[in-house]
Regions:
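A generic structural signal for short hydrophobic patches within well-formed alpha-helices
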Residues: 12, 45-48, 129-130
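Amphipathic coiled-coil/heptad-repeat helices and related helical stalk/stem segments
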Residues: 26, 107-108
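Acidic, PIN/NYN-like endoribonuclease modules and their adjacent C-terminal/linker elements
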Residues: 87-101, 112-146
Length: 146
């Protein structure tokens, strides 16, 4: 199996939340790409539980326990891989630091750095992630927009 795709939290949420506007699009993408493997990491898993259990996310927000149960059910997929945080924040941001323009990019930059470190790709619906790398940088191929 290839290194696969690290799913950004926006992809994880759309995958698991049936009323999410991108639920169908993410499932169609996964149907084409899941065979290459897909991954989560502690940061994406934590963010998933935090967001789905936040009443500001949905009037139907889950309890943290229910969000964990939903996460666990999705992670049972045979193509799922867990990527440990094997690279420090500082090391993962080194190639991206010059392009960081604000605090909202820090998490995306870390996830991209982890994907590069693992020789996988970051699958996201956030087009701004590609701006973390210069236009002609071959590492832009490490970002897959869904």
């Amino acid at each position: 199996m290839k290194a696969g795709f690290l799913l950004d939290v926006n992809v994880l949420i759309a995958m698991a939340w049936p009323t999410h506007r991108d639920h169908q699009k993410v499932h169609e993408w996964l149907a084409r790409h899941a065979r290459d493997g897909w991954a989560t990491c502690p940061l994406t898993q934590t963010s998933f539980v935090r967001i789905l259990s936040n009443p500001a996310f949905s009037a139907n927000a889950l309890t943290p326990t229910d969000a964990l149960t939903l996460l666990q059910a999705n992670l049972a997929h045979p193509a799922h891989r867990f990527w440990a945080d094997e690279v420090s924040m500082i090391d993962s941001l080194k190639p991206l630091a010059q392009k960081l323009a604000g605090h909202q990019q820090v998490t995306d930059a870390y996830l991209l750095g982890l994907a590069i470190h693992k020789r996988g790709k970051l699958a996201t619906m956030d087009r701004a992630v590609r701006t973390l790398l210069p236009d002609k940088n071959p590492e832009r191929d490490f970002v897959v927009l869904i």
